[in-house]
Amino acid sequence: MRNPVDTAMALVPMVVEQTNRGERSYDIYSRLLKERIIFLTGAVEDHMATLVCAQLLFLEAENPKKEIALYINSPGGVVTAGMAIYDTMQFIKPAVSTLCIGQAASMGSLLLAAGHKDMRFATPNSRIMVHQPSGGFQGQASDIERHARDILKMKRRLNEVYVKHTGRTYEEVEKTLDRDHFMDADEAQGWGVIDKVLTSRLEMEGEQA
């Protein structure tokens, strides 16, 4: 049985645009990319991260001074894939605004928080969840020990990223992320993951004017 998310993504609408050279058709995501809008949807994994990073780099090459909008609806996923997106967001010249629509959980919440200061938003019914990384490994005791040390190092690094972008102390972040911690949009604003809850595009445009 096919994954329903894969099925939905395969049914991508096409839009038709009139140009000087006649009609041009785009899939909806390519058309939105022309407007410097990137969608980060579904589980964060290597293939998806590669596509998001490529779009960020392409838009930087097109115009290094113009803002990029990243729309997030993700349950999280692989830490290394998410950190590839995070590092690219910090690396490129354009400011990247983030907007949560639906949910931003786990790695999705970190990417939401990583947007440019005062340009991190969520819609009123969004759900944000933060927690520490998880993993499992089987093998020799010495290998398990090495993997345990690595995941603890990863935990410290992720905590430091949240500290940088939320303004919380390391101790506050570590305590909050100890277990799954769910927040609505207002709570996420209070905790520092986002800067504002948006109910209309006019509010977003006002913030960025």
From Swiss-Prot:
Its job: Cleaves peptides in various proteins in a process that requires ATP hydrolysis. Has a chymotrypsin-like activity. Plays a major role in the degradation of misfolded proteins.
Enzyme Commission number(s) of this protein: 3.4.21.92
Family: Belongs to the peptidase S14 family.
Subcellular compartments: Cytoplasm
One GO MF term: ATPase binding
Protein's name in the database: ATP-dependent Clp protease proteolytic subunit 2
Location of the active site: S106, H131
Organism of provenance: Rhizobium etli (strain ATCC 51251 / DSM 11541 / JCM 21823 / NBRC 15573 / CFN 42)
